[in-house]
Each structure stands twice: as structure tokens, then as C-alpha cells.
């Protein structure tokens, strides 16, 4: 697989000016006239034509570059918004959980199912929407998903019972999954090689801000209205994103590249992807890295506040700093590392840092270094979270580079596996109660070591490095 190559849209989807079906064909001189004119005349004419073509090409290239920059910015903003919508839907709602419990007169455990339902919907929805986008293109399934998201979110704002709220949170997650899976597929349609890895790092910057600001937005909304107002705001965000997608996100999958089969064909495509050892290796590696992240999200409120006695404000500050570290390293990955080093080498380095940070956290929680305070634990979590900015975008890029004609299905498998593996691992951090951080560290070490094992055992990066060095 090539590790460079720029935008696939420039090579495949955008016809060169003057060569498309609507371009005028320049007149061709008869052979008799050319022979009569002599070699010198032909040479002079060729030189003049070449100069004219060069000048025209330069002007066309400049215009194309400006258009590409404007288009690239719009695509970045649209796809960034789509990938940020699911974390907004999850995290804006968190400050309202106690209020929902009181308002609907339901047990806390029942209201917590509204989070589980939304998360499950996001995981399963990707399996449905991904193959749909490979068959009907990216725009139609995305617009349909956005419309359903808006309707489901609006009904959540009006839900009179906990059961109805749970049901439409599930539908909200199913529909919101369209943004996640199709955003990745669009990136695969438009970019290849290191350009794709860079774009994923940019998306991580945008989507990484969402979990930081979402609880703050939810808390501010609660100052002026009740919990239903949060869903009203999310409905407005959904309407705005739907209009933006309809206006500015054009179709990126041409009809000739689409799959024509039904469910059977989609399942066959996914089975073929899973049969690809290297793709499956990157998929599981990314899922296990995501599980390390989920373990942190699930356990850190209790570890930081209950065990080490930090205030909620201190926890929010540390959570924000860790998110900033992830975003910053993601930008370093996209701007500096990708293109200068092989993606597998960068990914391997990131996974190694995650393993070392997780081991350090485990040793500290076991008391190997004596009694440690919050600062060393916070430092270990910061290093671990920052390294995610290298691991996560590069596993996605490497996996999708192997799927030229099934990016939707591949994106669905990547997203679903990450959510499912994370959902399985995250409850394990509370298996020993809220009084110890050891389960969190154990889950992180096991998942991190398993991620390295999958990367080495299934992806086998040294084999591709040897083939690339040999020019194969």
C-alpha cells in the first residue's frame, strides 16, 4: 500500500479541464498539410502550442488549487461537525441525569439506560449505515440519518416517560451513527496515504473538543431551562448540520464505484474485509486502544475524586488537560510525523508509549513506589491519553487504505468494533468497587498489551516495510 499519494479526489473524481466529456476537441490538421509544411514549420507550431498549453495549464492549476483549498476547508468543517455530534449527544446530557431522574420519577439505574441505549445505537447503527452508503452513495444515507436524528431528538425533548426516552435515545444513537461512519468513508473517498492520516488527525482535533465543551454547554443550558432544553439545543444543532450537509457536502462516491447487491452482498463484503488479516489486525488494534480510552473515561471520575480527594473542578481541569494533550499530539502526528516516517512506525511508537504509561499507572496503584499522590497518577494518565492522538488516527488510516471499494462497510466495522470492545472493557474498571484504581490500570495494561500483540501478530508491519523497500 502506498504511504503517499495526495488527494484521491484530484486523481479520480475531478476531471482535468479540457479532457472531460463537455470539453471542446481541438481541430486536427490533415496529414497532407502537415507533410507540405515541412519539419521546421511543424517544430515551430509544436513549440507555440506547447507554450500556450503550459501557460493555460499554469492558470488552470492556480484556480484548481484555490478551489481545492476552499473545498477542503468546507469538507473539514462539515465532517468535523458530523463526528462531533455523537459526543455532544452523549456528554451534553450528563449534567442533567439527576434532574431527569426527579422529573420522570424513575430510578437512577433506569435513567442510566438512556446512556447505554444511545451508545448501543451508535455501535449498531454503523453496521447498517456503512453498507447503505456503499450501495446508494454517501449523501442519501447521511441526509436520511440526519433527518431521523432530528426527529428522534425532538421526541426525546417531549418524552413523558423514562421508557419512551430510552427508546428514542436508542433511535437517536442509530441515526447519529450515520455521521460517524459516513464521515470516515468520505475521507477514504477523497484522500489516500499520508493525506488521509493527516485528515484524520484534523478530525480528531475537531471531534476531540466536543467532549471537553459538551458538559459545560449542558450545564449552562440547565441554568436557563430544564433537562428538556438540552434536547431542544441538540435538535437545533441537528437541523443546522442537516442544512450544511445538504448545501455543501457533495456526493463523493461515483455510481461506478458503488455496490449493487443487497444485504447478502453487504454481509459478503464485510466477511471479505474480516478475512483480510491485516485489516482485521488494524481494526482490533484500534478497538483495544479505544478500550483503554473507555476505561479512563469510566473510572477517572471515581479515581480522581473519590480515591485522591480532588474536587469536581479539579477533575474537570484534569479531564480537559488530558483532552488537550490528545488533541495536541494528534496535530503533531498530522503535521510533523505523518509523511516523514512510515505510518506503521509512528503507530508502533504510540502503542509502545500507551503500554509504558499503563504499566506505570499499574505499578503506582499497586503501591510499588510507595504511597503516591494525585500528581503522579495525573501525569501517567496525561501521557497515556496524549499517545492516543498517535494511535487512533493511524489505525483508522492504515485499515481504510486497504479498502478502496468498500469504505462504508470498512468504516462501519471499525466504528462498531471500537464501541463494542470499549463497552465490554469499561464496566470491568468498577469490578472491585470505587475504593481502588487497580482495576482501571489492569484493564488498561491488558488492552494496551493486547493491542500491541494484534499489531505485531496480525498486521506484521515489518513484512510490508520489506516489500516497500524492494519496490513491490
PLM regions: where:
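Paired small-residue
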Residues: 148-155, 163-171, 375-380
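Structural signature of the two symmetry-related core transmembrane helices
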Residues: 140-155, 235, 345-361
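Juxtamembrane intracellular "pre-TM" segments in multi-pass secondary transporters
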Residues: 61-68, 252-283
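Helix-loop-helix hairpin linking two adjacent transmembrane segments in secondary transporters
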Residues: 160, 164, 201-249
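Conserved MFS/SLC helix-loop-helix module at the cytosolic interface between two early adjacent transmembrane helices
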Residues: 124-163
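Helix-breaking motifs and short loop linkers at transmembrane-helix boundaries and internal kinks
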Residues: 103-105, 137, 158-164, 175, ...
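Cytoplasmic helix-loop-helix junction between adjacent transmembrane helices
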Residues: 168-207
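Helix-to-loop junctions at the C-terminal end of transmembrane segments
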Residues: 126-137, 329-344
